[in-house]
Amino acid sequence: MRFKLADSLSLITVQLILATSTLALSNPGSSSQKHSPNPSAPSPKGISVPFFATLERLSRLVDIAYCIGTTGVRKPFNCVSRCNDFPSLSLINAWNTGPLLSDSCGYIAVDHGVAQHGDSGDLTAGEPAIVVAFRGTYSIANTIVDLSTVPQEYVPYPSPDHGGSEPPNEPEHTCTNCTVHMGFLQSWKNTRQFVLPQLRQLRLQYPSYPIQLVGHSLGGSVACLAALELKVSLGWENVIVTTFGEPRVGNEGLARFVDEVFYLNDDNNPEGREFRRVTHKEDPVPLLPLSEWGYKSHAGEVYITKQELTPSESDIYMCIGDNDPKCIAGADDSLWMTTRRLFHARNLWTASDKLAEPNGFPSRFKLWQLLFAHRDYFWRLGLCVPGGDPADWGRGRYQGLGPDTEEL
């Protein structure tokens, strides 16, 4: 039987409503897979204003990546979205390898950290940095359906692919019994030819600038794999990663590897971590692929406890370890039910007729619009229009974050 578009969307919407309205679900599997909130846990203590300013600024930078593949980002640093917020940035290049899970979009820019007046009259200044932003997906098909692929062995690249003949360095860390999601790894393989040569040149030109990797959704998983190659295979230091709504990239071995490479088990200075995995209340994507299949989240989580926009410093919690019950791992059962319903609905999506829009994606796959929690990271990410998503129109700067606010 062939479904009409409206029928398909109605069925899936009903599933979402049923999922989010259910308060309890017995999660099948071992007790290690059972995630429940800790009612006696203390309320989050919040984060500092400088760290909040850093995360908020990076969320706008990754939102700009959604202009790649649509209206574009042009030199010096122009786009129809939030580029005017960053007059100190200079675009180096942008790439777009295609629309599939194994493809990638993003841009490389240099932030010279010089305060200037933007079109709105506000001053914007950031610390000098080389910025690499990885776009997420426009399609829920990529986010949910394609997360079903089989993982494969993960081995960091032994040497850069810039044509040099020097032998690879002996890595300080080794990845033992690691597997990685095939689609994520292939996406990075397709991307590295556009990123690594540029980064090598920029490091020589700006040796004191840190490399800031930032990604949303599937772009977060690519940023993670890119960072591992830079840190382990190339031995580069001063690499900082910030992801928003990052899926689980691989198995427990890979999660442990990320923890070791970025020293994420050191809780003495959580705001000083070099890997920040930002998650959001009710966002199902950080829970995918499912733990039943052996996938595991790495540490470094920064949890936004407030569901609706806009959060404040007191709404954000610095999580401890890979599986902090006060963070996304302790999501109540309704979120786990939502996640499973979203995933198992893939049979309905793939069995339905393939009505495509001009960009090649079936209309029914645009269900990411229903997953606001996956898009609401300080701002509503994912739409390249003036001022960002219409949900953000009329919103000024976050209170307390003036042009002179120091960032971390």
From Swiss-Prot:
pH dependence: Optimum pH is 7.0.
Thermal behaviour (record text): Optimum temperature is 35 to 38 degrees Celsius.
Enzyme class: hydrolase
Single GO MF annotation: hydrolase activity
Induction context: Transcript accumulation reached its highest level in 6 hour old cultures.
EC number: 3.1.1.-
Signal peptide: 1-24
InterPro entries according to UniProt: AB_hydrolase_fold, AB_hydrolase_lip/est, Fungal_lipase-type
Alphabetical list of SUPFAM superfamilies matching this protein: alpha/beta-Hydrolases
Keywords: Glycoprotein, Hydrolase, Lipid degradation, Lipid metabolism, Metal-binding, Secreted, Signal
A GO CC annotation given for this chain: extracellular region
GO BP, sorted A to Z: lipid catabolic process
Family: Belongs to the AB hydrolase superfamily. Lipase family. Class 3 subfamily.
Name of the featured protein: Secreted mono- and diacylglycerol lipase 2
Species of the source: Gibberella zeae (strain ATCC MYA-4620 / CBS 123657 / FGSC 9075 / NRRL 31084 / PH-1) (Wheat head blight fungus)
Lineage: Eukaryota, Fungi, Dikarya, Ascomycota, Pezizomycotina
Gene name tied to this protein: FGL2
